[in-house]
A protein has these predicted regions:
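Short, conserved charged micro-motifs
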Residues: 55-62, 177-185, 288-294
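C-terminal catalytic subdomain
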Residues: 225-267
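Glycine-rich, mobile lid/loop segments that gate access to catalytic sites or pores
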Residues: 40, 44, 71-217, 318
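Short edge beta-strands and adjacent turn/loop segments
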Residues: 30-45, 149-163, 265-281
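Short glycine-rich or small-residue beta-strand-to-loop segments that form or flank ligand, phosphate
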Residues: 1-8, 37, 44-53, 101-109, ...
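Internal helix-turn-beta structural module
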Residues: 264-327
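Short, non-transmembrane amphipathic alpha-helical segments
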Residues: 17-25, 59-73, 186-197, 251-263, ...
Length: 327
């Protein structure tokens, strides 16, 4: 099972604002230290920034980007800017080193995760407003028995190499009717890309409570509250958004993904604050995992290169690490 939200979801609006502030920091310094928390909704936007370069003097620029991303002209900005903690700042004086403690992993995305991400992106292209989507593979024993009720025994069902499990798909999309959604999204095309028959959707629910508008006057958004949507089964601890690349939550998670995509394997890692190198296990869930070590400076550079490739921290925050494959 997997849940994906689009960039107009209130929590993603908070992530995007945090990302835009990190972009601002990188426009001021080549290697800034910044951490941002955003809480937004019902006419208020509360932001706390710990930074080496952003101060209260940047309030006008921050208000401008808040209005642009939230699409709210009348919003009250409560901004607090503080300097980074001295001990944390000293950790980065001589060279870039691990900025925090953490465990990290990359799990190769499932068909469900990739499929739903592309469904979400297809809908967002047509209806760029608040949306949330859920897919569930109905594979419990009771469902299997019902699906193969003509079989002689459940034993035969369980040993089938590729049982055709049915799916349940829920689409909650604001500002669109059921008919509009079904007409606008290339649902059959996306299914064909992933080899999924449309007949496998035993349940398809669109806006279970009816037409809705969503947005920041219905729900409140907070930074890093949709990590499941951003990372799928790769979620461990810290958040991806509102942080510079000295933070392991950003850099090591991205590097795990880059290694995982290169080797087509699951990857794990851990590090402690101040570490100059990070050790990885490529294929950590296999019998003979491959050990790999990389300097933190190289990891941070690779992560920043990736962020720049997708268009910056604000663009990265739109979809997280699960960004979809359809073009």
């Amino acid at each position: 099972m997997f849940e994906k939200v689009n960039p107009a979801h209130p929590d993603k609006i908070a992530d995007r604002i945090a990302g835009a502030i990190v972009d601002l920091a990188y426009s001021i310094e080549p290697s800034p230290k910044v951490a941002v928390e955003v809480l937004i909704g019902h006419g208020d936007c509360n932001i706390i920034i710990e930074s080496s370069c952003i101060t209260d003097s940047h309030k006008d620029k921050i208000l401008e980007l808040v209005k642009r991303i939230s699409k709210e002209d009348n919003i009250n900005l409560n901004l607090k800017c503080v300097e980074q903690d001295t001990n944390l700042a000293n950790n980065q004086l001589k060279e870039i080193s691990c900025g925090d403690n953490g465990i990290f992993k990359y799990i190769v995305p499932s068909v469900e995760e990739e499929f739903l991400t592309d469904v979400a992106k297809a809908i967002y292209t047509c209806v760029p407003t608040d949306g949330k989507y859920v897919i569930t593979r109905m594979e419990n024993e009771e469902t299997i028995n019902e699906l193969y009720e003509n079989k002689e025994s459940t034993t035969e069902i369980k040993v089938m190499e590729e049982p055709t499990y049915p799916y349940s798909l829920t689409i909650c999309q604001s500002n669109a009717t059921d008919v509009e959604i079904l007409r606008k999204i290339p649902f059959k095309l996306i299914c064909s890309v992933y080899g999924i028959s449309t007949g496998r959707f035993e349940q398809l629910k669109i806006n279970p409570l009816g037409f809705w508008t969503g947005g920041l006057n219905v729900d409140t958004g907070a930074t890093n509250r949709k990590l499941g949507s951003d990372m799928g089964r790769s979620v461990t601890g810290g958040g991806l958004h509102g942080k510079d690349c000295s933070k392991a939550d950003v850099s090591v998670n991205i590097f795990c993904m880059l290694l995982g995509k290169k080797y087509h394997k699951n990857v794990s890692a851990s590090c402690s604050i101040g570490d100059k190198h990070v050790n990885f296990l490529i294929g950590f869930d296999e019998k003979n995992p491959i050990p790999y070590s990389e300097s933190y400076e190289s990891i941070a550079k690779a992560a920043l290169d990736y962020i720049n490739y997708v268009g910056g921290f604000e663009k990265f925050a739109e979809w997280g690490l699960l960004r979809g494959d359809l073009k």
